[in-house]
Swiss-Prot record:
Family per similarity comment: Belongs to the UPF0303 family.
InterPro entries (UniProt xref): PduO/GlcC-like, PduO/GlcC-like_sf, YBR137W-like
Domain of life: Bacteria
Protein name: UPF0303 protein Rleg2_2653
Organism: Rhizobium leguminosarum bv. trifolii (strain WSM2304)
Length: 165
């Protein structure tokens, strides 16, 4: 897929993966689902679910390093700043030949890399973020999308990003 195709698909994901309602219990269920998927697959990832600025779920699975904690924070900051996936933000910056610093942000606090996805509620918008760190960025992104699609009973095959060319 090209950057433009990826950006188009991610926009579709962000629209389709919206909840009617989302509370602390739903946040915990989302985090637990990601933890179960990662454990079944032997993935060494960090998982974070944050509502507004409140951490609700965090798990670090075998293989995670202290660096992943910082990656989670920085990717989540991208979502909470722009209300779109960190991967979409990174792809757009790359397409435009820009960096986060060009937008007046610090790379120490913002990571435009895949793995954080907005938690959207219909009629409200972005209320938080679900973040995965530990895999290549496209895989982090796809895993977050997979968990959201499973929770919302959406067809993952029509939402998932295709393998890169």
């Amino acid at each position: 897929m090209t950057i433009e195709q990826d950006l188009s698909r991610i926009a579709e994901q962000e629209k389709a993966l919206s909840f009617d309602a989302f509370d602390l219990t739903t946040a915990w269920q989302l985090g637990k689902l990601l933890q179960e998927l990662a454990t079944e697959r032997g993935l060494g990832i960090a998982i974070d679910v944050t509502l507004h600025s409140m951490p609700v779920f965090y798990a670090a699975l075998p293989g995670v390093t202290p660096d992943n904690v910082n990656w989670v924070r920085r990717k989540r900051n991208m979502v909470l700043r722009y209300f779109r996936s960190s991967y979409a933000s990174g792809l757009k910056l790359s397409k435009d030949g820009k960096t986060v610093e060009d937008n007046g942000l610090s790379g120490a606090d913002y990571a435009p890399h895949g793995g954080s996805f907005p938690i959207n509620v219909k009629g409200t918008g972005c209320i938080g973020a679900v973040t995965v760190s530990g895999l290549p960025q496209r895989d982090d992104h796809n895993l977050a999308v997979e968990a959201l699609a499973l929770m919302l009973a959406k067809d993952l095959d029509t939402l998932r990003l295709d393998p890169p060319l």
